[in-house]
Amino acid sequence: IENDLLEAQVLRTNPYSKMLIRLQGKDDPDPIRRVFLTGANPFVLKTEKLLEIASLIHKYFPSVNSIGCFARITDSANKTDDELICLHRVGYNGLTIGVETADDKALAFMRKGYNSKDILTQCKRLEQADIEYGFFYLTGISGKGKGEAGAKASARVFNQPHPFLIGPNMLTIYPESDLYQEIQNGN
């Protein structure tokens, strides 16, 4: 991680002009304010590791005041309320949570490991820690002929917490997956 941060620090825009600004002791006219951690869902990492990553980010980019990342609803369930508050204090905010849907039947079928009540519980905990979040919603995940019912179930749940965004996405189905076979069987 530290090597990636060093590389980003040097290559952010025009490395030559950035180097001159730094050597002349001038303030960067366009400092980095937000870092977004990529990968499947970095928020699943233990709090200690997330704090270590935040420390490195602030070391190499002291102007950063927001650290975002992808997350699952179950990630915050594995953290205490105090840990969530601590993570917010070091900059974690603006999480992108792949809730997928709030259709409990679809969540169970997809073996997501949570239900619509868990979405509400964990979002409330994030809000109490002042951590803002947005949702990724997978259209069509409720199955053949169930799209409207799934969308309505999701709307009922998604209208209760306060996501800054609900972004619809498509689901990628790989031929070697169980879901692909379900689709082939007309489900």
PLM features per residue range, with description:
Residues Y180-N187:
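C-terminal accessory regions of radical SAM enzymes
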